[in-house]
């Protein structure tokens, strides 16, 4: 893995005093950049985990996704509190859930504060497990606050042998130690509306649609065809971003220099063209209009989504009557059943959640059992996929489903696991780095004004440079492709 971000004492102090990194002017309107990872004291780094198992397991996360997976599939669960704040295990251990939403860097800021207090915290208050996302995983992986999955926790190479390599690469520290593990792999595909594909291309067959979208030139050609028939190719500015950003030639930052990859400028060029020609709906990721474009009133051909996005976001947005309002996940409710997936113009991944054991935990045995059960047990992982359509991190289980008669009703009877199984081994994490979240967010936000037509290209670049240098004072130079 690439060397970790260098954090100065001044920067760390600023992060802890303010709770967030400096907010830039000009184009910074969303969550702040990933704050600096807390630096462990020498005493914490050298301390040994207590031998006795505690009876309280503290798990920190930012939403209820892992909580649901844990409560539904961890074999040792005995009962769940009515308010879901605690889970009791068969041996009497009480799992306490701390869920702090991601908004405005809230999760990381509170996690950092808690980790800084980890050494002095009472045994039942210490964090035992915490979750991290791909975009900032290295921040914690390269700190002393994460346990070595093999050396400290006790999982073996055999336990981990069926996992996709990239899911281990992203949580391997600069010394080669594996510092986390995950139940999911998140290869990306292009999810398209079958009815719109028929109107534009004359077919909704995934193999034939893929032929029309297999590279960016073909993709752009179909965008023109869709526009001519009254449809949008994409909903907004950010939809294709991950497909470009996952195919860069180098990490964002080397020493004190940030380099904007040429492929990111290809995204800028394409997105500006789509905005000018009406090929997109000028939305932004996660806004109401973007989500509405995925539902019954939408006129958008497709969306770039990874595994979790299809079953967790797209399915929900496709329904006319949400499940919370009494609707059912079935054909006839909105456009459920009108989607299908194909590989699209380039392989990519998006997101993912990793389980990390926290330094100082007195529940090493329980952490080991949780990791082994939820990220290595092929039977459990196969059940997660068949129940939820989430793509799990077990090659054996996924190949079994890929080669079966499994069908997704949401995707019109398609076995999308087969496509994911083809794409997942191609994911390359060699250019991932600890700056990814902050740099990617800044790129998208600062160029939105350019896509909207309120600033020119040079101003958008200047805004990006200003934002980056305010977020990351250690970055002194930003290079653009010629």
Region spans (language model):
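Long, aromatic- and glycine/proline-rich binding clefts that accommodate carbohydrate-like moieties
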Residues: 336-337, 385-449, 477-482
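Conserved N-terminal structural module of periplasmic/extracytoplasmic solute-binding proteins
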Residues: 9, 22-138, 382-385, 455-482
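Helix-loop-helix "hinge/cap" segment bordering the ligand-binding cleft or interdomain interface
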Residues: 150-161, 169-240, 252-285, 359-365, ...
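Periplasmic-binding protein-like
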Residues: 69, 194, 372-402
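Hydrophobic core
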Residues: 12, 16-20
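Extracytoplasmic/periplasmic substrate-binding proteins
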Residues: 71-75, 266-369
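Hinge/lid segment of periplasmic solute-binding proteins
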Residues: 40-46, 108, 119, 130-189, ...
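Short helix-initiation/N-cap motifs at beta->coil->alpha
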Residues: 100-113, 214-218, 282-296
